[in-house]
Amino acid sequence: MVRGIDIFKDFFKGFENSYVIIGGTACEIHEENYAQTPRATKDIDIILIVEALSNEFVGRFWEFVKSADYMQRDKATNEGMQYRHEYYRFMKPSDTTYPYQVELFSRNLGLLNFPEDAHITPIPTSEELSSLSAILMDDNYYNFTIAHSTIEDGVHIANIESLICLKCKAFIDMTLRKEKGEQEDSKHISKHKKDVFRLASMLAPADKFVLPDSLKDDIEKF
């Protein structure tokens, strides 16, 4: 289990509908539930549910950051006309019982109004935005992920089927960028591909899901 997930769960009890955990942590929880050996992951990737976000959640999250005493605090903002989003990354807690890294992604600007003394460092969005978070700027992927999520053992995580869609898309996008000569880590590309098959093995033969056309097309490309 990801280090600090129990602390995270206790801290955000009552706020489960304000966020969804995606990425490796969500995969790990599903793998443990299906008696698979989870691959190691040290970060918690979170998307904020804009429609359910409250000032109370923002205040609670800041308390979490202060309690952990994260030494590295980064923020990236994209104010372009097509995609507007904010991305936060908190790393290296002084209290090592907390998660090593927590990443927050919001499709709207200005939702997380941390205090002026938060000491958050601006970073280039294009450099640091995670592959899964970037995909969630797409309405179809965002809405499908939110709709196909559940509260599991006190934390809100993406379901198996939505993780498969996200991982397929990440694999496709990263592979295309690498073919164009852009710098992409082959290990990360391979990781997404392997995750798809690990997750698919957890689906029952009777499981059927209706996908938006764009997601269906990406699954077929994969």
Residue ranges of model-derived segments:
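Compositionally biased terminal segments of proteins
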Residues: M1-F222
